[in-house]
Amino acid sequence: MSGISKLSDFWVEKYKKESKKSWDKFYKRNETRFFKDRHWLDREFDCYFGLPDKLPLTILEVGCGVGNLVYPLLEVQPNLKIYCCDFSPRAIDFVKKHSCYNENRVFPFVNDITEDSLLEVLGSACIDTLTAIFVLSAIPREKQLRSIKNLASVIKPGGHLVFRDYCDGDFAQEKFMTSGDPSMIDEQTFVRQDGTLSLFFREEDIAEWMKSAGFGLVTLDRVNRTVDNRKRNLNMKRTFLQGVWKKL
């Protein structure tokens, strides 16, 4: 724990309260340039998105950002109907401005999953597969269970939630812990310089929250990657959690 400066209660509450504003500023500053398109999702989770000759599936992506997952997925799965939400209005605007936007296939909307009912928007449990890719880590620990229950409310019985996010022990967490800057909310949650939150999950925590929300575990694994940063002469050992749960 040496080298870590914990934030005061005042700043912890301020960063949590202004999280939505911080993400909207992030998209104002970076527009569509920051995140790469996620072309790996259909490879990692292909059986949860169906094949082109199967019946259409209804997908919900939470924390969709500017559409880096939505549009690559539509390219390879033409029968999908995708709802997507983000709590940044600016991000949703970028989704709608995308050159491949089709209002008959893509249905973007603003939603804060920690507070806003998804069921009120969708009207029923109509989702076959829900994706939560690097989104729950932006939510404080105390709001995790409520948020996951919100996700569960719109998934069909037998439908699936697919998940990938930051894991305890990741290089980025170690960087936070040795930076010397006052950025720590707790041992697993930190504040980036732009004011956004980053929670590093432990397997037992996410497994318990999912179970309490009415999901049965299909698979949960650590994914280890080594990323070379040649400019900074760094070998970064990235560690993510990747899992699938079934709505009971």
UniProtKB/Swiss-Prot annotation:
A GO BP term, please? tRNA C3-cytosine methylation
EC number(s) on record?
A: 2.1.1.-
Write down the InterPro entries for this protein, in alphabetical order.
Answer: Methyltransf_12, METTL2/6/8-like, SAM-dependent_MTases_sf
From the UniProt record, list the coiled-coil ranges: none
Q: Does the keyword Kinase apply?
A: no
Subcellular location per UniProt equals: Cytoplasm; Nucleus
Into which EC class is this enzyme placed? Answer: transferase
Binding residues annotated for S-adenosyl-L-methionine, in chain numbering: W23, Y27, G63, D86, D112, I133
Which superkingdom, per the lineage? Answer: Eukaryota
Record's Gene Ontology CC terms? cytosol; nucleus
Task: Give a Pfam family name.
Answer: Methyltransf_12
Keyword list (alphabetical) reads:
Cytoplasm, Methyltransferase, Nucleus, Transferase, tRNA processing
Q: What happens when the gene is disrupted?
A: Cells lacking trm141 show abolished N(3)-methylcytidine modification in tRNA(Ser). Cells lacking trm140 and trm141 show abolished N(3)-methylcytidine modification in tRNAs (tRNA(Ser) and tRNA(Thr)).
Q: Which reaction does it catalyse?
A: cytidine(32) in tRNA(Ser) + S-adenosyl-L-methionine = N(3)-methylcytidine(32) in tRNA(Ser) + S-adenosyl-L-homocysteine + H(+)
GO terms (molecular function) for this protein are: tRNA (cytidine-3-)-methyltransferase activity
Family under the similarity heading? Belongs to the methyltransferase superfamily. METL family.
Q: What's this chain's function?
A: S-adenosyl-L-methionine-dependent methyltransferase that mediates N(3)-methylcytidine modification of residue 32 of the tRNA anticodon loop of tRNA(Ser). N(3)-methylcytidine methylation by trm141 requires the formation of N(6)-dimethylallyladenosine(37) (i6A37) by tit1 as prerequisite. Does not catalyze N(3)-methylcytidine modification of tRNA(Thr).
Q: What is this protein called?
A: tRNA N(3)-methylcytidine methyltransferase trm141
State the species of origin: Schizosaccharomyces pombe (strain 972 / ATCC 24843)
Q: Which gene encodes it?
A: trm141
